[in-house]
Amino acid sequence: LRFDSMEGYSKNATDKMPHSWKAGPQTALLRRQLENMRNGGTVLICPPGNPFRCPPGPYERTSLIAHYLKTHKPKSKIIILDAKEKFSKQSLFMSGWDLHYGDLIEWRAGTAGGKISRVDPQNMQVETEFGMEKGDVINFIPAQHAGKVARDSGLTNKKGWCPVNQVTFE
């Protein structure tokens, strides 16, 4: 994870805005935050821009959180602030969300106010081109790069990833 990829975000910020990308203390923290959130609260989910590991991951997480909220905190909502204009398996997720959760989930593409320019963990808000967005729980997933072994071995490009030929997978 690239903790320096967003203004205002750092390893220290994960205590208030967990990325929860790796299982363990971060996922436990996100769970506690959801349990402690008031009924009627807002969860902001902020996926990273492409590329990143497990492209469906943030949207699978959205589905799990939506199920929890529908069951335990039905007045709450989720806003996905997504820098991307589309995401992996989007039509499947959107139709499932519409069927099971209705207006509980709102997805905002980058050009519709989803692109975040900075985060403010102290005040639990993020800034988009349309202004500040406050969340009771903010799951901010920072930009990513290839693993340490690949980086230390000099296999990565300037963007931090290992180039792959999409035809041959070499």
Residue ranges of model-derived segments:
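Rossmann-like NAD(P)H-binding beta-loop-alpha module
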Residues: 23-76
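Short, conserved acidic/polar surface loops in the N-terminal third of protein domains
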Residues: 3-12, 54-58, 90-91
